[in-house]
Amino acid sequence: MADAPTYIRQSTTGTATTAPTTMPVHPDTTYYKTTTTTVSDAPRAIADVNDDNHDNYDETTGLRSGEKKTRPLVTSTTAPIDAGRMTLGQKISRWTRIGSDLAREALAEFLGSFILIVFGNGVVAQVVLSRGAHGNFLSINIGYGLAVAFGVYIAGGISGGHLNPAVSLAFAALGKLPWRKLPVYMFAQYAGCICASAIVHAIYYDALNNYDGGNRTRGDTWQSTAGIHASYPQEFLYWQTGLADQIFATSFLMIGILALTDNRNTGPPGGVVPILVGCLVMAIGLAYGFNCGYPINPARDMGPRLFTLMAGWGSRTFSNYNPYIFNDYYQRIPYWFWIPVVGPHLGALLGAAIYFFFIGNHWPTLHRNVLELQVGHRDNSDDIELLAAKSRRPIEVVTTTETTRERRT
């Protein structure tokens, strides 16, 4: 038998609220009529439904209104929510919400990269400006590992939490990120790092003046203070070794990221991945941080370096010239700035290729029965087909912006 109809007010955002039975028509609101039908063994129940909807028979579709789940009563192209009844929080949310997925992802990458530098370089500033009294190289490694983890936690649900142009490039090469999004991701990452460097500089401005007397170009201190923001090589390092350092260190980073996010592998639950990526960065720093400070991220190095160029350190931040270090230092690496940019991009591509050819391309046809996938931005169609074939049961796929989940039905 048919229950009394209720009216549902539907907004363009997908939220719905139940309206009174007597429908108050608002010109900027779309209402839908729904009828709840209870089916029993009594023939009268079905007859009631047919009789109740006899007058609403649609000859075009051949269906009665009672056979439809919803029927629009009032339509409008204007705002679906009555602005007069919105709370302040709802109004702010409505005014500030961005409709473009790419713009939201760019904001997420900006904020994640900002968090990475504001914590990571903040630790470096504390160690350098206190002359080691408030930390050491281990503190820097731990601080950067935690900074990476928090940055990925913040941005991961929206953009994947790359925070690194080299990682974004590798994901694009693997087909996990559309190429059209790559320039936007990179721009957001560089912008976030530059802004974060400005915050670190402002917070430690007085301590910096106390350290170098306000002279950013002083020969015996400029590189140590500029090194708060960007990487600089040891005086014994040749450019060939520095480039190899960045290529291989970043390839290790990319191999680890792909292993952690590959659901066919023995990866962790999705919520643990940012912590393990932070541990991976910390391990790279502990193993390969001596030569040049393991930038392994073009935005992390070039963004703050651009800030130091504008904030008083001058062109030395790019030329690497320092007369206070023995004479052949400048001849060994006359221009260091390009190595932490080119090296990580090459290294990320190398790491992606290594993982693909050694691991990713060799999974058995029917891998273990994975009931839930949480991988961010990648196509899971192959996994879904394999799981359905193995279980011999249909698979219902629920797709959202951030994750793709599959379960048995």
Curated annotation (Swiss-Prot):
**Localisation per UniProt entry:** Cell membrane
Membrane-spanning residues: 110-130, 138-158, 184-204, 241-261, 270-290, 339-359
The UniProt entry annotates the motif NPA 2 at 297-299
Keyword terms: Cell membrane, Glycoprotein, Membrane, Repeat, Stress response, Transmembrane, Transmembrane helix, Transport
* Sites carrying sugar chains: 215
Q: By its UniProt entry, which Pfam families does this protein fall under?
A: MIP
Please report the record's description of how this protein sits within the membrane: Multi-pass membrane protein
* Protein name per Swiss-Prot or TrEMBL: Aquaporin-10
Give the domain note: Aquaporins contain two tandem repeats each containing three membrane-spanning domains and a pore-forming loop with the signature motif Asn-Pro-Ala (NPA).
